[in-house]
């Protein structure tokens, strides 16, 4: 059954079938041709896979990100980031990172962050003399903060599967996200200084004040979301609803940049993305069911434990596995398949689930940055028109190195659980 499922999945992907349908076809084929399980289990597993109130947060944050893009909120975020950062050497590239960090604090998606912020900043970076390869690498690296800085779609999936607090996971991603963002900014500064481009200029307080006044309502959006979650005012799902309502009010009544027709178009495009994401999660649960029927979970765990029983060693094994999977499959498809297998093993070893959740999110992001088919890498390459050889070897390896360093720090040091324990108290 496993062989039929995997072969069917590979064939579907080779023929260009969208990942959601590829997973659904492969899972259905595996059950039909390789088992005696009744076919209604396909529908049953699909709906059980998405039957969680917490999963409502995902389509809500997708809609919030779409509203931000169409309503002029993302543009104002970029303008504000530019006002406070563009005076630095390498300021245009640093602005890309800073704006991505702010946008990530609402969207929860790496792909949405790359598209929304990269679409604005990439032309400016190219005008300033940055190479297409460097521009693609920085856009991908900065956009990948979407699943790390709260709210994070990947962490919502982790929380739904494991039952761990999504709010704690969100807060646990703040420090790693800021470390990565600051590291990328330093790399931008070094690159610009070494190549003598993007000289920056004089810091102008009046420009910053004007940008701040114009973007204050946009900047309040991530503050309300993160502050509300950290303060216990609302759950992750409620935060998604607040983000949608707030973004809509600001876009329609404050900035007056969204008409009724625009809103309908936003709903239409966001609905397509919502449906695809939920289909990926639902069909992935069929894979988990097949793995359970075949006893693959225990076989994989036994194999890993035969290599090492050290939690640190197991972390690195899982990271390597997640990176390989992430090169070929979106994290939303990989997590529902892999987590039910891996999570009980780490829980039995007493590993902190805040640490495990953040490391999983970082690992899937790393897979999205890694060739041959990392989704973040290809999105940014499409935006810049760069080629693989110009992007990966000179620049993307440094971005990947930064991500790896932060993952190692999160494994060796209690970085992911420090802030959640400070805000919510130690997890029981």
What is each model feature region?
Residues 1-428:
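Alpha-helical transmembrane segments of multi-pass membrane transport proteins
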């Amino acid at each position: 059954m496993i062989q039929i499922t995997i072969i069917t999945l590979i064939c579907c992907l080779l023929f260009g079938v969208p990942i959601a349908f590829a997973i659904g076809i492969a899972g259905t084929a595996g059950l039909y041709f390789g088992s005696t399980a009744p076919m209604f289990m396909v529908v049953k597993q699909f709906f059980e896979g998405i039957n969680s109130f917490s999963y409502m947060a995902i389509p809500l944050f997708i809609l919030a990100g779409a509203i931000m893009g169409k309503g002029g909120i993302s543009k104002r975020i970029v303008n504000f980031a530019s006002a406070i950062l563009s005076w630095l050497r390498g300021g245009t590239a640093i602005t890309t990172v800073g704006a991505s960090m702010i946008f990530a604090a609402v969207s929860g998606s790496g792909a949405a962050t790359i598209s929304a912020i990269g679409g604005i900043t990439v032309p400016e970076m190219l005008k300033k003399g940055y190479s297409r390869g460097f521009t693609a690498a920085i856009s991908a690296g900065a956009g990948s903060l979407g699943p790390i800085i709260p709210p994070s779609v990947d962490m919502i999936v982790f929380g739904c599967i494991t039952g761990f607090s999504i709010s704690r996971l969100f807060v646990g991603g703040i420090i790693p996200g800021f470390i990565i963002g600051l590291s990328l900014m330093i790399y931008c500064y070094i690159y610009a200084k070494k190549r003598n481009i993007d000289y920056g200029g004089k810091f102008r307080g009046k420009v910053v004040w004007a940008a701040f006044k114009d973007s204050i309502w946009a900047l309040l959006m991530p503050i309300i979301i993160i502050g509300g979650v950290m303060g216990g005012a609302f759950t992750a799902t409620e935060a998604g609803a607040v983000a949608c309502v707030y973004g809509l009010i600001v876009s329609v009544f404050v900035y007056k940049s969204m008409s009724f027709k625009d809103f309908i178009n936003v709903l239409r495009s966001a609905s397509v993305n919502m449906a695809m994401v939920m289909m990926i999660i639902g069909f992935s649960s069929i894979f988990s069911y097949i793995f359970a029927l075949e006893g693959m979970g225990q076989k994989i765990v036994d194999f890993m434990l035969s290599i090492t029983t050290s939690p640190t060693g197991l972390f690195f094994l899982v990271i390597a596995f997640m990176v390989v999977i992430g090169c070929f499959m979106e994290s939303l498809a990989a997590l529902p398949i892999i987590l039910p297998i891996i999570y009980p093993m780490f829980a039995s070893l007493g590993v902190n689930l805040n640490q495990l959740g953040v490391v999983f999110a970082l690992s899937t992001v790393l897979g999205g940055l890694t060739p041959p088919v990392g989704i973040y890498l290809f999105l940014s390459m499409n935006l810049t028109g760069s080629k693989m050889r110009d992007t990966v070897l000179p620049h993307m390896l440094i971005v990947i190195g930064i991500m790896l360093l932060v993952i190692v720090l999160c494994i060796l040091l209690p970085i992911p659980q420090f802030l959640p324990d400070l805000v919510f108290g130690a997890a029981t």
